[in-house]
Amino acid sequence: MAVGLLSAGIIGVSSCDYLDQKPENLKTTDMIWETRVEAEAYLYNIYGYIWLSTDDPVVFGFADETSCVFSNTNVRNMVEGNWGPSNTLGDNKWSAAYRGIQKALVFEQNIDRVPEGVLSTDLKTQYKAESRFLRGWFYWNLLRLYGPFVIFEKPAEQDEDFNNYVRRPFDECVEYVCGLMESTLNVLPDVWTSTAYLGRPTRGAALAVISQARLL
């Protein structure tokens, strides 16, 4: 009886040790900033929060130029009065924009941790400018879609009380967008010479956002 219990205990301990093992390929946050590939992948992920202008192909139905016959579009939600906090224009672009902003802030806060021999100072400067442009772009679209927004200067913590954050005055929001864009003008090129950078922001794109924001 004693031998049987001892054997069962040994088997149980062995099973626990086997199940408690950590996957060898499990990535940590620190590992992101150890290699160029991982750091660049993090930046590219921020670009993924940019939504397409064709997200809702029947936007004409928002006005009176035409009627929308599709039943599963955002247009129907508006004209039928079915919009709510969790069911908004464009599949809640408010949430998508702030996710992109938070990731951009994390990127800018940590990109300098990548070793110099892995990622040059010039590339770090370029990537930070791209990230600031993306933040400005997200904020600019928040302003256009929803009006004044909440400004984050650093990544938010998960346990923060977000009720303490308030929307800033409209003029302050415009200046904030313009400030982010202006901070990229001496870094972003007029034209990217390599096809590897197609789709990246340019100096002209930043100036275009500034001019549109000033006209609001």
Model-identified regions with their sequence ranges:
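Sec-dependent bacterial lipoprotein signal peptides
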Residues: 1-14
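Membrane-proximal, proline-rich intrinsically disordered regions
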Residues: 15-61
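Conserved, well-structured interaction surfaces
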Residues: 35, 40-52, 73-146, 162-175, ...
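Short, solvent-exposed turn/loop segments enriched in Gly/Ser/Thr/Pro and often Arg
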Residues: 57-72, 150, 198-200
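Aromatic-lined, polymer-binding surfaces characteristic
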Residues: 141-142, 148, 152-154, 197-208
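Short edge-strand/loop segments of extracellular domains
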Residues: 155-159
